[in-house]
Amino acid sequence: PTYLSIVATIQDIDLNSKSTRFDEPVGIAFANNAKAYVALSSTNRIAVVDVASRKVVSHLEILAQEPRAIEVRGGRLYVIPFESNNQTQLSGGKPEDLDGKLVTFDARKLASSFDSVGFTVDVVKQPKIPDKDLFIFDTQTDKLVSTVDTLGASLFGLTVDASGNIYVANTDARNHVNGKAGTEKHGLKELDNRPYLNRVSKVSAAGGVDFFQLNPLPPRQPNRQEAVATPFAVKASRDGDVLFLTGAGSDVLLALSAKTGEVVAKAKVGSVPRGVALEEDASGKPIRAWVMNAVSNSVSKVAIAGNSALQLEQTIELHDPTPPVYKEGRMAFNTARSSSNGTFSCASCHADGHTDHLLWVLDTPHLVG
């Protein structure tokens, strides 16, 4: 079969102002030969594009931060926001709502104060905060069909198998685990040096949600050499038995059981792998994976045997004018090798050099003006 594909989406430049138009197209999927969808990350919208005229004919509003990964399957458009949240906030509220748990201080008084000295401030999970992580649209009507909540905090990759099961590669922040800095004097110790869980969230065709943890859950620590950090790109085999997943912080390609989440094979690839595509034989069995390594600017050609065993065949270096010292810095920023347990990197909190927009208790020195 022939598949429509795209090499890249490119940010438009206003030639008069010499600036970008600030819609940041980062993902594309085709409903059919006549209609395409483009994720506009910075504007929290999906552009609906008429292929024949190459014009944007409408937009789908995404009520979440930075929609990036999108996929069309079975008459449905699936969208996940890159910078989701995990319902955490400061434990402030109205005086009449003080309960010592979700509300521990008067937010109005803190707002007029220089700093938080004298206030009992925690980071808490507030269940009333919206946390929509998956948006599903009908590709004929472009109407929103359903949403799914609380799949993760930073959502990177998305795949849908032939049976309608949805898999989201993500990290889930644990900033609430040591969040009781005010009421219980929490600090970094309570975090167990595990700020994030690296996982794949599965939404079954029937709507059930399961989480495939790629490392042992705290307080257990993984073998540093076997740990997986920053699951990014994910692709399901045609038969739905195997997931092929990149670990962007670990420079690996993984094969996972789609039923249990067990890692059944692993291959070392280039620096910061963020894309994967499968090559299949006539029967639909995957025979090769092509992995895009974002920071080393290379493509890894990985042989697949028996639907899961992985063997690196070749690394194809692409032309890259980036100064070597810049690339080395980006590698250091994105790799989890500097962490004691191999589960997080600088980029875990600061993906693409930005922030995760979450509150953390980090035992940093108090600042005095």
Regions found by a protein language model. Give the residues of each.
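Short loop/turn segments that connect beta-strands within beta-propeller blades
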Residues: 2-3, 50-54, 138-142, 204-207, ...
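Surface-exposed loop and turn segments in beta-propeller and other repeat-based domains
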Residues: 3-20, 83, 103-115, 129, ...
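Beta-rich, blade/repeat-based domains predominating
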Residues: 17-32, 63-73, 131, 152-161, ...
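Residue-level signature of beta-propeller blades and closely related beta-rich strand-turn architectures
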Residues: 42, 83-84, 172-174, 249, ...
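The canonical Cys-X-X-Cys-His
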Residues: 341-353
